[in-house]
């Protein structure tokens, strides 16, 4: 049985336009699940409805088999971390983390023990007496995370907590959050619009669009087998082709309205290759190139005037110059039709 379950959730802010449209979603115990989608798709509204900060107009929300739809936030035993750290400026690290425990009226010895354990877990040892103004952005976010989990909630909600942090630090925090979540085995829902973040951190990804779940699956399933044109356009950097462009390339009719090909599925060669039945073959010239980290991307204009992007690990051999003639092939199983 699912640990968290959304059943036919409906939500409107103006009484007419639905932000959440009869949405159904399940989360297994101990998983880190990501709600991934563009701004305005309803992902934060869904998260806040689970926390009890937003009412719903229809449906029900269940945690561990219990209907919590009408429970106030304080009765749901949920920890939440926002993009804003919301730390108390007049309290040091230890005091900020201990705040929730004091509200639960725990004894001082238990509070001290729990705070010490969490500080070690989030790697803030030695910062106990520091105030928020003395901390970096990453340290502040770890304090906010520690404060959310020290009370041992049943569920942890993370609403774009890393979006205001620079790229390098964000990658380190992504790994730390995942490590902590696994160590505590806490059921977690993470909201982001960053596909790379979702791929790195998630057990399961739910791609959202216009108040609905477009597709659910593991990161590998979502990336390699997008079920809709929207998912293909939002995940990765697929080459998205119209049916007419694809027919130009292949000289064959297609029943699909859209075609998607991953850039890394396109192989390139300086010479023509032997043909097989399970591949498609194109010819063209290099019109642009970019390097992102260790990924080299070529933009190739085929002889039919269709632009394709081909991605590969950067190597010092088999490099192509702009204007170079190039021969492409792609396995037919990597050509997705919608």
Residue ranges and their predicted role:
Residues 32, 73-227:
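ABC ATPase nucleotide-binding domains
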Residues 36-38:
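The feature captures the beta-strand-to-loop junction immediately N-terminal to the Walker
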Residues 44-47, 143:
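ABC ATPase nucleotide-binding domain helices that frame the ATP-binding cleft
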Residues 51:
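Helix-to-loop junction immediately C-terminal to a conserved catalytic motif
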Residues 59-67:
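Conserved ABC transporter NBD signature motif
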Residues 249-338:
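Non-catalytic connector elements of ABC transporters
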């Amino acid at each position: 049985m699912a640990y968290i379950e959304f059943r036919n959730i409906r939500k409107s802010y103006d009484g007419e336009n639905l932000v959440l449209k009869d949405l159904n979603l399940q989360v297994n115990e101990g998983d880190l699940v990501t709600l991934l989608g563009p701004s305005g798709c309803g992902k934060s509204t869904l998260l806040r409805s689970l926390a009890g900060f937003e009412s719903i107009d229809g449906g029900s929300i269940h945690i561990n088999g219990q209907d919590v739809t009408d429970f106030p936030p304080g009765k749901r035993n949920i920890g939440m971390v926002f993009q804003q750290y919301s730390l108390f400026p007049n309290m040091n690290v230890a005091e900020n983390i201990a705040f929730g425990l004091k509200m639960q009226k725990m004894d001082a010895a238990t509070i001290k023990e729990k705070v010490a354990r969490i500080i070690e877990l989030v790697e803030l040892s030695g910062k106990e007496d520091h105030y928020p103004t003395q901390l970096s952005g990453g340290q502040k976010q770890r304090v906010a995370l520690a404060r959310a989990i020290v009370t041992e909630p049943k569920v942890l909600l993370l609403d774009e907590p890393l979006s205001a942090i620079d790229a390098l630090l964000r990658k380190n925090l992504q790994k730390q959050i995942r490590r902590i979540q696994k160590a505590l085995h806490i059921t977690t829902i993470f909201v982001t619009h960053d596909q790379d973040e979702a791929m790195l951190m998630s057990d399961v990804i739910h791609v959202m669009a216009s108040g609905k779940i477009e597709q659910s699956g593991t990161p590998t399933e979502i990336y390699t087998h997008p079920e809709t044109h929207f998912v293909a356009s939002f995940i990765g950097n697929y080459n998205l082709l119209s049916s007419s462009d694809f027919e130009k390339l292949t000289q064959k009719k297609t029943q699909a309205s859209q075609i998607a090909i991953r850039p890394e599925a396109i192989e390139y060669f300086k010479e023509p290759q032997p043909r097989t039945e399970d591949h498609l073959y194109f010819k063209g010239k290099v019109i642009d190139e970019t390097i992102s980290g260790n990924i080299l991307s070529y933009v190739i204009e085929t002889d039919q005037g269709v632009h394709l992007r081909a991605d590969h690990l950067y190597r010092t051999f088999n490099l192509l110059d702009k204007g170079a003639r190039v021969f492409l092939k792609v396995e037919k199983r990597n050509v997705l039709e919608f």
